């Protein structure tokens, strides 16, 4: 006990001297707190206010100078039993109040430092941030590192270092560099830990703090490892996917091929009512697409290399169809279509309530050249309607040449009853001539609400005899589309002439429709292909344009123009814009139509077919063996001139 009192009394005197040397007139309030020693004896100490930061710095310097004096007064035995105490701020939000209490209230307690002056240095922190500076180490570098440490628990471990040598090792630790890079320095100010430290002055708790584990356990604080984990952030690698882009390869071809196209036509005729009012009537002659069965032609048509993908590119040509609307009341006996499953609509009717002798007409056409580019086809056809001998044509007959158009494409062979998409383009001149307007839908149906029952009777009185011829080809490969335009022309000689005389008085023109006179009038059909990924609609002065898109067929557009010519059957091909006013005395008119589509149709394994309907002047041309053979031979010669491997079959003959 005597040795303890011998150490305690000089310590109190020294503390009193230091307090007097650094005190100021503004320091007044003090209170006593217990000082806990190893034998549970209490000694009163003082609490006083601190001066500004300049005086506090001076105080710290003085304390460091007194360290050797206090160290010499302490023996080796008393150093191990020294007091365990650290200083904490009594108020978190106060900048001036400091306590000189020797009570230790930390989560980890250790032995006290042997230097009493270091205890005084710990009591001079004005606020929470300076408290951390004063309690850690007398070296400024380590103090700065501790002020920005985000974990309050690690600060308490720094304050309880057992020896000055251990404090020096803390200042040379490599963790301060990571502590300075911590992103949360503000957490020290808002940490509730200092308040909990100031509210535990119980001596009994201090006794338990003196029995804390060895200082080596203090150096194993997990706080630096947590700081290292905070610096780890995920790395996003999404920029690589954004740099991926597709490249489209285009190919160009330029070849010359034979023609493989025929055209569908509609022959508008004029019916005169008893009141001499013009009525428009229509009869149809339809053909399909004639396909070339040679596979090499299709391989070289739309590609310039021998790759496997390029071999699948073929051509699917459109067929230009001109026909009148089909009337639902026509029975299968009166209909001239030989095969209902083929989906070809063909009829003859008169759009007038009164029956009269219609005029006669002759259709002649010829394929001149085909322009192909990247599997996209554009067809230009010219139709000539020549006046028959002994028939007087009215002025409105030429306007009837502006006809209603239908597009016919080859359906896939898997369909039992294929449906052909249609688009209707009706000229404005026909509307002024008394023809009802026709409605167009995506399915190709046309409104016939303007047809009356009296018209039905007239249509049933018309008689016609038809013959159907089917042309089959070899299967094609899958189709494709390229993007760069290249044009190629091929001149095709020869003429496919289809005669047709409309009306019930066909016998008068029997001699005129003989096959020997078929070449007297012919016009050219121009087939053009251009590269285009989408459909294009072309517009002229008095035409009505229409285009549509379905799932099973590519998009296309169609428009019509008209041109007036003389009565001479040898008509030159002339493209002019149709005038809204009909000519004064026309005897022959020509109509030109274009179609453009992207060829993506796959005809399938069974190949395509061509359904040809021929209306002749006399039933003897079909019933008599010689006349029928003559007709078939002529068709065979014309088709074989373009496609050597075409197969022809005579389907049926129907009588109206």
Curated annotation (Swiss-Prot):
InterPro entries the record matches: MUC20 (IPR034551)
GO molecular function per UniProt: identical protein binding
Known tissue expression: Highly expressed in kidney. Up-regulated in renal tissues during renal injury.
Bias (Polar residues): 85-96, 114-125, 159-170, 560-573
Compositionally biased residues, Low complexity: 171-227
Keywords: Cell membrane, Cell projection, Glycoprotein, Membrane, Repeat, Secreted, Signal
Glycosylation sites: 366, 570
Annotated segments matching region Interaction with MET: 604-656
BP GO terms, sorted: hepatocyte growth factor receptor signaling pathway; positive regulation of apoptotic process; positive regulation of MAPK cascade
Location of the region described as Disordered in the Swiss-Prot/TrEMBL record: 85-125, 159-232, 329-348, 560-592
Subcellular location field: Secreted; Apical cell membrane; Basolateral cell membrane; Cell projection, Microvillus membrane
Region (Approximate repeats): 180-227
Keyword Glycoprotein found: yes
Signal peptide residue numbers: 1-21
Sequence-type repeats, residues: 180-188, 189-197, 198-206, 210-218, 219-227
GO CC annotations on file: apical plasma membrane; basal plasma membrane; basolateral plasma membrane; cytosol; extracellular region; microvillus membrane; mitochondrial outer membrane
Involved in oligomerization: annotated segments: 399-603
Assembly and binders: Interacts with MET; oligomerization increases affinity for MET.
Known role: May regulate MET signaling cascade. Seems to decrease hepatocyte growth factor (HGF)-induced transient MAPK activation. Blocks GRB2 recruitment to MET thus suppressing the GRB2-RAS pathway. Inhibits HGF-induced proliferation of MMP1 and MMP9 expression.
Protein name from the UniProt record: Mucin-20
Organism: Mus musculus (Mouse)
